[in-house]
């Protein structure tokens, strides 16, 4: 395998800033595809000439864009205009006119889409072999299954063919392939990523997911893709705050000794115990909890009424041409026959009751930590029993979307037998950034190479989490570094965290005063304003009141939304004060305004 340029985001940024062209990366991608020599990874590989043209069209390197020139692939149940979507069923195939919302977001950010990947048909399975096109091979061990349903997307990342990929996740399809191929799998809060242009499996439970070689890369791709899509009736507005270091102390819940399941795999049990010990050493407070209610919820996904949702998604084939479907897939979805509306409501009630039992417990932790899978499944075992091993792989994944939780799967140190180690962190909806930060703690302790490559990952240098004794404040003018009023922060013990920008929801003014002009930040219609440059400072709580006294009207402190949708305290201006002010929203940067003023 070629190892010239590791395809982590950080390595690509370094390469591009040093003069490497996106065309060189495209050539490397296609060379890797040839070397891996697994024709079952892709269901639609785009022509290299087309990608070279797209790479050339990117122009000059844009250092401010984390996805500029980053290669990726998507699961073939996600639409790309003019390219067939099959969901791994030839008779279902169609050619969409529009590209899925999430894919558009990534391409607009400069990412290069290489192709569409193989999957368990109609995203029904956790094994990756339920496809009439031939199954992709596990990137690390040919004996074990690649994991599904997002098999091709997981394997492509593990081989270092691309930097990241999109899968989908209903029962664990964005996590099991990650566990089996030594990569990261991020399953976001439901509704955070648009499902427009995605073939549904269980529409009420589906989410697009992200595979990457590192936690930081997975979260960065997720942050770019995440945006509210009014065309998706299941979309929700979520915050995607910048990834920061995990707190020095955090609470983790794990399955109790009486409820944890390893299917007799002592090596897997030892691997998980080592990870728990490492978490304890890094500041985690570990508490065991009974997972029995979660297992009951997990079993309901395929054995309860939710299988009828899969029937709805495939009804035209199931009723008109059932022989067109993969036999095991047809059998699973066909089990919906006989399910009644009464069964559905009984299922809803039971899940709600169990969720009510578990919610108070889950809420006491920063995250749950589970073995990503109880044990491994070989291709031979699956051939002998197409159903049992698949169900086992969903032990720690199937309940997550039914409870509207978020999750991230992360590699740990390799097991004693050489197979990949992996754990998954799970938390309440909206805690995606928190569990990603915790996952970096485990990632830093792993000595494994990335995926199936020989690449090593540097531990990310993440900004600190704001401590409980400080207030984070956004400043946009004379209080910034190097300006006259910065001393009012520094003399109170404030610390500069980083430069950032607001969400594009603000107007920016130079307010007329008797002396020098002052900045005025005013909120306007969402998405109709400017993204204004700010600095973020942490100021001690006991000094904040004194700082507030230094702020004259028409300025004040209020809530300011940053470009990642996180919210901090910050300077705002009364709208009436802008009537005679100069609108400098086009500059959107006080430093640029002052430089222009003195030029």
Predicted regions and their residues:
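A short helix-breaking turn/cap at a secondary-structure junction
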Residues: 187-270, 293, 437-465
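An N-terminal boundary/leader segment
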Residues: 1-56, 281, 451-457, 599
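Acidic/His- and Gly-rich active-site-bordering loop/insert found
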Residues: 51-53, 61-131
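Short helix-loop capping/hinge segments that flank enzyme active sites or metal/cofactor-binding pockets
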Residues: 67-89, 246-255, 305-359, 409-419
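Short, surface-exposed loop/helix-turn segments at secondary-structure junctions
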Residues: 93, 235, 300-302, 306, ...
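Glycine-aromatic micro-motifs
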Residues: 440-445, 450-599
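Short glycine/serine-rich loop segments
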Residues: 99-100, 104-225, 401-424
